C-alpha cells in the first residue's frame, strides 16, 4: 500500500492510497480521512479510533464522497476515521459493460463476488470490501505495535445508492458475526432482484440462477436473519429523487421486515424536496454520523 497524495482537511488529513488487491487482481485506490485525534500528541495509547466505511454509488471513485459529502467535520467532532473505497476494479484488462453504459462494469461493481465470466476474474468486490481492505489498512497503519486505528472490530458501514445497497447487504451478511456495529444508507437500492439496476447487475455478475441473487438481496436476506438487541438500520431518501420509483423502492424493505424480528428496527426517513445528489447526502451526513458515533461508543 502506497500513499499517492495527502491533504490537510479540517483538523486531520485525507490520504489517498493505492495497493495491489488479491481479490480483484488489480490495483485499487482508496481514500481515508484520519481525524484530528489521530495526530493529537496526548491521544491515549490504550485507545483506538473506530472506523466508518462509506460505499459510494454508480460511476463514483473514492474522491466523490471524500470531496462532497463533508464527512470530515463529523469525523473530527466524534473521533472516527472514515474509509472511501472504490466502486469496482479498473483497468484495460478489466471487463466492462459491452453496451458502454454507466450502470454496469467499471464504476458499478455492486459490492458482490461475480461468478460469471468475463467478470469473475476481477469483480470480487464483496471479499475486497469486507475482508481484504480492512486487513490491508490494518497492516499498513498499525505497525510496530503502534495500534491507533480500528479497522476490524469497532467498525460501522454506510453508503449511497449502489453503495447504500452494498452497506445494507454487507451488514446483514456479516450480522451473525457482529462484523459491523451499525449500518445506515442514503437512497439505497434495497431490493435489487426486482428493479432494473439490480437485475442488470445480478444477471451480468451472477447469472440467471435466482438462488445466487438471494445471497445478495437485502429484502431476502433480512427475512432469514434474527435481529438482536436494539440494532437499527437508518435510511434517508429524498421524495424528489428521480430514481425513487423505478430503482430504489424503499417501501419494499419495509414490506420485507413486516412480521419479522426487524419490523421495528428499520427506519426510513423520506425527506421532502431532496434529490439523489451529494447536496442530499451532505445534508444528512451529520445525523448518520451521530448514529454511528453512538453505536461505536463515542457518545
From Swiss-Prot:
Purpose: Serine hydrolase involved in the detoxification of formaldehyde.
Record family assignment: Belongs to the esterase D family.
Keyword Ion transport on entry: no
Thermal profile of function: Optimum temperature is 50 degrees Celsius.
Miscellaneous comment: Present with 1750 molecules/cell in log phase SD medium.
pH effect on activity, per entry: Optimum pH is 7.
Record-linked InterPro entries: AB_hydrolase_fold, Esterase-like, S-formylglutathione_hydrol
Protein name: S-formylglutathione hydrolase
Subcellular location: Cytoplasm
